[in-house]
């Protein structure tokens, strides 16, 4: 292959590193209205009255909107970026009289500059009826205090939701008699695991610019992963036709799932629609930390049974998830906690997976890389590590006895067959990379420091099978170059480059001959968006199919110009020539010009792809940590990982994805946490309090690949974006256990907890 599986530089790399104007705030007029939001100081309250009279008199203020400007009995909407009908409930109003978390929107203020808007915000007088809040998600289900008591709350999908019970979702599934299987096991691990909410903390905060175009339509330029879903969300929130909304995206300064929720879009859209003036809203870092869409807090009760020789026979999992004040992504994230952890163990005879998603008066949760699988894998993989210790077995040897194999029917994975899998090879590769045999379990380095290793496995999906859609449009231009139009959003991942590589491979042309345009709801073909690890696998397949069709048509038109049958010509990427006489040829440029002059053979195609399967990528990770038993400090000296993502379309970009995900997983394990005070106020409201590991906080990260070949993916590719965050959690927590002999069931694991555990043992 000439372009696929080659380490090309990102197409936008030079523009980014040289500081060219590519992000939203670089591209828009600076004299637009500034929009800011007045937010609730209470976790649960009703706005009795709101007085904006004085604030409206501030010079430069254009408009102030409150709940009185939004019909409270109107149909609600969701901000989740999901295919319609969304699994997430319709539980929001643009501005609701009932505020449900500290940071919920009370008023929208628009003015000519920040100074006047900030002054007006301080002059708005609000009288609240403060209500008792639901702040403990353990007590939320069937609590007499209802987060959503309203009658116009609506669930479009059969997910077991009931707002009168504070239930955003409930589900049960299983196979076999799990209780009987566990009763017959020699060893049963039975523990509850708890992962806290944590932030995506992308560099570019939420931001949106809106204007009215020549035809009176609302144009929205937003830092989003989901242009088509955002269009629907905006239209639903404003109660206007979708045909009146256009959404496009510039380059995006990071998303990691946060921008799969339309967090910022509806507010400037409302201002512009009402005033007919351009406006922008840019979240401060405080707002992005306290009123965004973080990972769901989850608690997982795992019962895992095995024989005395280490064969896992049954897994019983109950997950309780905290969706916060609104239900975005609640019903779908919780499913992955079981459906992306249990299938790793292909020899299990029975499983049961039950889940509840509850409303509380915390910040609304959303999508974050890993999307629920991260939490579930921490629980299940930690239980497997504990099983290995209980059986006095090497955790790697135990994994090799149990891992799902290619051709297996995967438990808890909707009856799907494993069509591509190099998981066992990944396990062996990581054992070699970290020098497991010499480092496991621990080594006392003296002076109170102990080094230890731990490992974990992970899987994810490749898109949402049978639901989400990827599309691509390809056309040959008049000078012999191609334009690829996509609806997927490049969030910095380099998908514009990888999709262009797929097209270039089929068309046998240099990568620079493919220009990429996207994503814009007016001109891009429909695409569900860049989430669920779908872009390479789903949109990539659409691109491959589209390029193949275009190649066929190029040959067909070339044959017509050469006056010979279509099956008598070949195409080498530059010319179409007659097979029997290669001197008879037409250049690509000649064919392009001919297509524009009286010919009926089109050289522009759109292809759409939906996959009935979601083949899992796999990853194995191992961590070496150094624990200071006096201070409790943990240093991650080395993290080694091996990934099976099928064929890596661009190995460099794939490796960078893995390294970034590993770093995020390390942060979730050791430092990152959202905590609330007794009144529901989040404490970590800036990056001073919310500790993200920097690159110099971590030692060496090594990533290798063991490639399987996925027959349903483009050139054998699967996904890479999400699986990479999942293994640090169980690997590091088990390494800490190997160092100090205390097992932790809650994340993050802090130095204080470690120091106290060591002191308690002494």
Name each region found by the language model:
Residues 85, 97-98, 241-249, 273-284, ...:
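Conserved catalytic cysteine-centered active-site region
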Residues 67-68, 239-244, 274-279, 308, ...:
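C-terminal catalytic domains of large/alpha subunits in multi-subunit enzymes
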Residues 462-524, 539:
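Catalytic phosphate/nucleotide-handling subdomain of diverse soluble enzymes
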Residues 6, 12-15, 82-85, 161-208, ...:
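Glycine-rich loop/linker segments at domain edges
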